[in-house]
Amino acid sequence: MTYREATAWLFSTQMFGIKLGLDGPRRLLREFLAYPKHGVTVIHVAGTNGKGSTCAMMDSIARACGKRCGLFTSPHLIDYRERIKVSGQDIPEADCATGLTELRDLCERLDPHPTFFEISLALALRWFGKCNCELIILETGMGGRLDATTAVPADVCVITPIGLDHTEWLGDTLQQIAAEKAAILLPGKPAVSAPQPEEVRQVLEQAANQVRAPLEFITEPLLGYAVALPGPHQRWNAALAVSALHRAAIPLNFDSIQYGLTNLRWPGRFEVFPAASVPGASAPVILDGAHNPHAADVLATTWQAAFPGQQAAMVFSAVASKDFPGILKRLAPLASSIFFCPVSNPRAVPSADLAAALPPDAPPHQSFDDFATAFGAAVTTGSPVLIVGSLFLVGEARAYLTNTRFQPSVQ
């Protein structure tokens, strides 16, 4: 198959939905010969917010230390290949097509059929093996206990801040969600966690004690280094990343940490496009993937530090599984006007439903049929434009702003 044919087949497997469980991915990884080789270090990352940024920091710092690193994250923003990186480079189209062709032939013989995420994980691990990666960083897709990435034995486990998200799958209390994510902890393997609410901390400590996994909680942000990603929360993510690499026996020093954090590139996380780079804009355009109330709180803090006293023309969209009323409650005070649009996703919330979820004291709002029209209206206000509510929206917006072919996804 060509690359486009291969990804078309892959995206067609999204019809199989999400299947939590480890038997399927274990079978697929075993039959595709994708399990990491002996001696390869694996870092496994779960949590609600900050997973991608923390993974990207670990990858960048490890590469600055001279390690050949494989990075598996989700979702992608613009191009599927973003999910699978070696040494900071996306998997090439030709190798992606070859791997997916082999996987299609294998999957046709398997019952039940592997899911989109399981296939992506198998493709990533096979590519990491071919590239002789010394370190592999795996971000969970959802939860932890039954996430496909948990089929891969890890040497270090990382827990980023935990909040309420994916409640239809993981439970509707912090304790239930924490238990799902704590299940990635392995007997005797070191683990490190971001600061957590007390009820979450208790769950993590109990889980660590049960499997005798040495667990450390980060107690202060990483200071004394320049960090490419804006916001005080990113210094906490940096501290978590450095601690995890230390547990993985990566030889760290000041220069490698500084180089990794300074040269880090992780789009869509308070990413600022200067006005001069956006046709028709007279103020910056900011993209942020905040898609739950906790992330919205973090975004509000970052906005107030970056744009003190300024309000945004906010372009907002969300998918149905998210607490968009809670997000809007926290972000509406940042906006002088709000422009709703449906994201390119079957689970997109209609603009009218988004508008109906606004708090009573919300600023003026308008609804549009697509992102391009909503963005065009927001730009005319002359205010900084904040595009937020979903990583799927951020991906669509980034493709629009960079004039890049967009591969929409539902997972």
Feature-to-residue mapping (PLM):
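A conserved segment at the C-terminal end of the G1
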Residues: T41-V45, S53-G70
